[in-house]
Amino acid sequence: MTCDKEKTRGIRPGDIAVVVGTGRSGVAAARLLHAKGARVRVLERDAANVPATFAEWAAGAGVEIVCGAHDAAHFADAAVVVPSPGVAVATLRPYLPATGGPEVMAEMELAWRELSGEPVIAVTGTSGKTTTVSLCAHMLRTQGLSVFLGGNIGTPLCEYVLEGKRADVLVIEISSFQLQTCSTFRPRVAMLLNITANHLDYHADMQEYIDAKFRLFRCQDEDDLAVFGEGLAPLVDRYGVKARRVTFRATDRFAESRLFGAHNRANAEAAWTAAREFGVTLENALQAVATFAPMPHRLEQVAERGGVLYVNDSKCTTVSALRVALEAFDRPVLLLAGGKFKGGDLEGLIPLVRERVRAVMLFGASREVFEAAWRDVVPMTWDATLEEAVRRAASAARQGEVVLMAPATASFDLFRNYGHRGDVFRAAVESLA
């Protein structure tokens, strides 16, 4: 596993730079490339996705926006291509020259090359990234350090560079999508929380997904820190990680917390492992965890009515995430599940479902998948909408139970995204009589 820093050409004034996508990271990349003197061309398949404010800025800045299907001519003269995180690199290959083509780099990589030496904590993993980086940033701020928190969560790193302010530490959430096109990115602390099957609609296979995750460590050396969750040691050895290695696991050290579940105690340990590299004391770490508010849509308590707890875990989009959600509660669960199923072993959850789930209220798509796995294990019902499923669960719930929405699916059957799904759940709970 080697770093590609010797292979990079850099971006020079007058170079043509192509940005694919006009989401927040694409817009930030286009602005930074323009500031560096590049001639910027932005590609967007759907003109309706181009923000009006960006279109206005681009017109004044001389930045070209091309809408519609991609064409090889759009890339032929480019020195660099920056795809938005949701754009699979493989889908661009047919348009790129077979040899001597442009450097393809993530928005994160582009911004990294413009930093002024600020230390970076970068966190990846199949699940737990957002909670862990947010906890870590809260610990650092409790210690009195200035922190930029961003990347795959909220603010793109290019926006930080453009703003010009400087922080003591940058805490970055980074996805496999972004890592695939990072070539010189070198965090002071790099963290891999876990790996389970996910995003196989984007990656060619599980091996490509794992390869992407381990790109986070490829430019580190012995002066850096590599942090891993339990069970990853065989992979760490296989990829030859050079940095100092530390493994974290859940303990009771951070038991005073508003977060549910052992997995969140593990997330707190992971955050503390990184934060103490920058002088954060245990006292301040404990204070930070105790005052940390749960992240929206991640085992988020939205209400307690008549002794029944209502929990929104809309970010639960996989079977492995459902296991974690169910293990977080020691009281009976009425489970709301359903949506666009991404695959996974529902049968493997049968012992846990039998032990902890009193009833399953399905909604939306994938009804047949869940029923095939669990129809002989637990009582199941189905409703066309989430709102109907919430009302059904509320009427059946008893004092001391949990109504848990942990869908184990993508949200795109009925909703714009998992956040929209979580908001609908919250509104449905709030509307209960």
UniProtKB/Swiss-Prot annotation:
Its EC number is 6.3.2.9. It is found in: Cytoplasm. Keywords: ATP-binding, Cell cycle, Cell division, Cell shape, Cell wall biogenesis/degradation, Cytoplasm, Ligase, Nucleotide-binding, Peptidoglycan synthesis. Pathway: Cell wall biogenesis; peptidoglycan biosynthesis. GO terms for biological process: cell division; cell wall organization; peptidoglycan biosynthetic process; regulation of cell shape. One of its GO terms (cellular component) is cytoplasm. Pfam families: Mur_ligase_C, Mur_ligase_M, MurD-like_N. It comes from the Bacteria. The keyword Cell cycle applies. Its main location: cytoplasm. ATP binds at G125, T126, S127, G128, K129, T130, T131. HAMAP family: MurD. Cell wall formation. Catalyzes the addition of glutamate to the nucleotide precursor UDP-N-acetylmuramoyl-L-alanine (UMA). Belongs to the MurCDEF family. This is UDP-N-acetylmuramoylalanine--D-glutamate ligase. It comes from Nitratidesulfovibrio vulgaris (strain ATCC 29579 / DSM 644 / CCUG 34227 / NCIMB 8303 / VKM B-1760 / Hildenborough).
